[in-house]
Amino acid sequence: MEAVILFPAIDLKNGQCVRLEQGDMARATVFNLDPAAQARSFQDQGFEYLHVVDLDGAFAGKPQNAQAVEAMLKTVTMPVQLGGGIRDMATLQAWLDKGIARVIIGTAAVRDPAFVKEAAKKHPGRVAVGLDARDGKVAVEGWAETSTVTALEIAQRFEDAGVAAIIFTDIARDGLLKGLNLDATIALADAISIPVIASGGLASIDDVKALLTPRAKKLEGAISGRALYDGRIDPAEALALIKAARAA
C-alpha cells in the first residue's frame, strides 16, 4: 500500500513543547522545556517527518517561536512541516528559506484563499492547508473564532491549486485521547483529490491500525501528540506496523 506517515507533533508555547486540550491555551501541559531535544528524541525513535505548530503565532498572526523552530531545524535532519502565524508570502518564504520542508496555512486559507493559491503555485509540494473543524465548521485565529464554512467547502477551493496536503483536525477530540474522527476525515479525503492528514484525538495503536485499512487508503497519514507523550502509543510498535504495511 501507499506509505502512511505518522507525524509526531510538537506544539510550541512560550518556547516550550506543550499539548493543549481542544486548542485551549489555558489548558496547556508542558511536556518538554527543550523542543529541539524533543525533536531529536522523535528522530532517534525512527520517525520520518515532524509536525510543528507555533501556537502563540497562530493567535498573534505572526511567528512567535522562531528561535525554538530554528533550534529544531539545526538539531534534526528529518523534514519538518510548520504551521501557526503564516499569513503572508514574506513569512512563508522566510520559513522555507530557513529549511522548513512544508508550511501549513490555516486562518489565511479561510480569509485569503488567493494567497494560498499563489503560494502553492510558487512552491509546488511545499504548501499544506490546515483545516480545524468545530461541529463541522472551520475555526480560525488559533481556534478562537469559528467561521461559517465547512472543511469540505474550503478544501474544494484548492482542488486545482497544487496544495500538497490538507491537515484535518477535529477540535472536539484534540488532546483528549478519544480516538481519531476517521469517519469525517475519510469522508473529506474521498470527496477531494488532495491528500488528507488526520489530526486530533489519536489515542492508541488501534488508531494506527485503522489508518492502515483499505477504507483509509486516501489518507497520507496522521499526527500524534499526547498519545506519544503519555506513552499510550509505543513508537517502535507503531512504526513497525507502518513499515509492514508499506511492504505488503
From Swiss-Prot:
<protein>
    <recommendedName>
        <fullName>1-(5-phosphoribosyl)-5-[(5-phosphoribosylamino)methylideneamino] imidazole-4-carboxamide isomerase</fullName>
        <ecNumber>5.3.1.16</ecNumber>
    </recommendedName>
</protein>
<dbReference type="GO" id="GO:0000162">
    <property type="term" value="P:L-tryptophan biosynthetic process"/>
</dbReference>
<comment type="similarity">
    <text>Belongs to the HisA/HisF family.</text>
</comment>
<dbReference type="InterPro" id="IPR023016">
    <property type="entry name" value="Isoase_HisA-like_bact"/>
</dbReference>
<dbReference type="InterPro" id="IPR013785">
    <property type="entry name" value="Aldolase_TIM"/>
</dbReference>
<dbReference type="GO" id="GO:0003949">
    <property type="term" value="F:1-(5-phosphoribosyl)-5-[(5-phosphoribosylamino)methylideneamino]imidazole-4-carboxamide isomerase activity"/>
</dbReference>
<keyword id="KW-0413">Isomerase</keyword>
<dbReference type="GO" id="GO:0005737">
    <property type="term" value="C:cytoplasm"/>
</dbReference>
<dbReference type="Pfam" id="PF00977">
    <property type="entry name" value="His_biosynth"/>
</dbReference>
<dbReference type="InterPro" id="IPR006062">
    <property type="entry name" value="His_biosynth"/>
</dbReference>
<feature type="active site" description="Proton donor">
    <location>
        <position position="132"/>
    </location>
</feature>
<keyword id="KW-0963">Cytoplasm</keyword>
<dbReference type="GO" id="GO:0000105">
    <property type="term" value="P:L-histidine biosynthetic process"/>
</dbReference>
<comment type="pathway">
    <text>Amino-acid biosynthesis; L-histidine biosynthesis; L-histidine from 5-phospho-alpha-D-ribose 1-diphosphate: step 4/9.</text>
</comment>
<keyword id="KW-0368">Histidine biosynthesis</keyword>
<dbReference type="InterPro" id="IPR011060">
    <property type="entry name" value="RibuloseP-bd_barrel"/>
</dbReference>
<dbReference type="InterPro" id="IPR006063">
    <property type="entry name" value="HisA_bact_arch"/>
</dbReference>
<keyword id="KW-0028">Amino-acid biosynthesis</keyword>
<feature type="active site" description="Proton acceptor">
    <location>
        <position position="11"/>
    </location>
</feature>
<dbReference type="InterPro" id="IPR044524">
    <property type="entry name" value="Isoase_HisA-like"/>
</dbReference>
